[in-house]
UniProtKB/Swiss-Prot annotation:
It holds the Pfam family p450. It comes from Aspergillus flavus (strain ATCC 200026 / FGSC A1120 / IAM 13836 / NRRL 3357 / JCM 12722 / SRRC 167). This is Cytochrome P450 monooxygenase ustC. The gene is ustC. Its EC number is 1.-.-.-. Gene3D superfamilies: Cytochrome P450. Disruption phenotype: Impairs the production of ustiloxin B but accumulates intermediates such as ustiloxin F and C.
Length: 403
């Protein structure tokens, strides 16, 4: 046998043994899942950047059950009751949260002890009490100044600066993305939009809110039950986060459905999957129906709030979630005071941008490499605009899902 043939045969034999071990003799072999996902991480990587990831995850749970082996060392879960188990206070984040800059921030710190210390340092600035002091000053001006002064490609940023920039990014990108979803689902349902507008007019007439031409406060917006129901339903039905993985704790591991998960296993679930769980929200969980929040009993509402997942879960829940809610309530109330006409246009090829951060370990040093690209997939373009025939003056034109 020639050396080349021997080398090729040996390579294939090693690969075959590795595949057999991962598929049938791995500690996670007892959990069902797709074959490719159990033998290679490329399966998970591919679906992370695919625009239909959430639909694919839903199909996996339909086929394999509430716990699916998604990668050689990873599980995805569709069971709200397991959220407190997965996101316990000792759970460390995985390498999924690779730092965007070459240093860690409060958000990207993997070790829960380091996160607690970092969280305490900024809690006074973005916590619940700070929210009331800063309602009228929160905006994008600071973010614009920071990026003009420090280019991430030319200037090294120190840790406090990284923390500040990532905090601004969280408030200036994730929340508007959620706001777009709120307005989209309200505007595409005429009955919901009409009911919300009637609530705004009634609240204006009885003095609960100022005239619709004035600026509404967060406190006043929270007095509107149907507006609150629309926002909570949009957060359930169309969240912005894809998944939030955690490692099974060192030393103890986890127990999921009476099955042991060894330490170091990546366990994740998705706000989109939990929000569509029929055991939690009923058989119409796949429908956008804000009325469910008004019809729910106090026990049901408490249960839904307990498993609310759009700002994260557990000890690492977003510290500034009050700021995000403030933006959602205030802007949604202002925009929906002007009836919106929704135009949904089909595009043969819709471009979706993706951004992947790769964490590479070379010669003992960690390097962060970002990869950007575009996927061309069939899709729809949404343009929402104010009804020009409405009695209020002004014009609103929003491309909510820009390619």
């Amino acid at each position: 046998m020639s050396p080349f043939i021997f080398a090729v045969t040996l390579t294939f034999a090693i690969l075959a043994l590795g595949i057999l071990r991962r598929r049938y003799f791995h500690p996670l072999s007892r959990f069902p899942g797709p074959f490719l996902g159990s033998v290679t991480s490329l399966y998970q990587t591919y679906w992370h950047v695919h625009p239909n990831k959430t639909l694919h995850d839903t199909e996996l749970h339909r086929k394999y059950g509430p716990i699916v082996r998604y990668s050689p060392n990873g599980l995805i879960v569709n069971d709200p009751a397991l959220l407190p188990v997965i996101y316990n206070r000792r759970a460390n984040k995985t390498d999924f949260y690779a730092p965007v800059f070459d240093t860690h921030s409060t958000f990207t710190r993997k070790d829960y002890r380091e996160h607690v210390a970092s969280r305490k340092a900024i809690s006074h600035a973005v916590g619940f009490l700070a929210f009331f002091r800063t309602e009228y000053s929160y905006g994008l001006v600071l973010l614009m100044i920071i990026f003009k002064q420090y280019s991430v490609t030319n200037t090294r940023l120190f840790e406090p600066q990284v923390d500040g920039i990532l905090s601004e990014l969280a408030g200036s990108s994730v929340t508007p993305s959620q706001l777009a979803r709120v307005i989209f689902h309200i505007s595409r349902n005429f009955k919901v939009q009409e009911k919300l507008y009637e609530e705004l007019v009634a609240a204006e007439q009885d003095g609960r809110i100022p005239p619709l031409s004035a600026i509404i406060s967060d406190e006043q917006a929270h007095r509107l039950p149907f507006l609150s129901a629309c926002i909570r339903e949009a957060q359930r039905y169309a969240p912005t986060m894809s998944q939030l993985p955690r490692y099974a704790p060192e030393g103890t591991g986890l127990e999921l459905h009476e099955q042991y998960v060894p330490p170091g296993t990546s366990v994740s679930t998705s706000p989109w999957i939990i929000g569509r769980n029929k055991d939690l929200y009923g058989e119409d969980a796949n429908s956008f129906r804000p009325e469910r929040w008004l019809e729910a009993s106090p026990e049901e509402e408490r249960r839904w709030d307990h498993f609310s997942f759009h700002f994260g879960y557990g000890a690492r829940k977003c510290l500034a979630n009050n700021f995000g809610l403030m933006q959602l309530y205030k802007v949604a109330a202002e925009v929906c005071a002007y009836p919106i006409r929704c135009l949904l246009r089909y595009r043969a090829h819709h471009e979706c941008r993706y951004f992947v951060v790769l964490k590479l370990k070379l010669k003992g040093r960690t390097r962060i490499q970002s990869v950007e690209g575009r996927l061309r997939v069939p899709g729809f373009a949404l343009i929402a605009e104010q009804d020009p025939g409405h009695k209020h003056n002004g014009y609103i034109n929003m491309d909510l899902f820009r390619a």
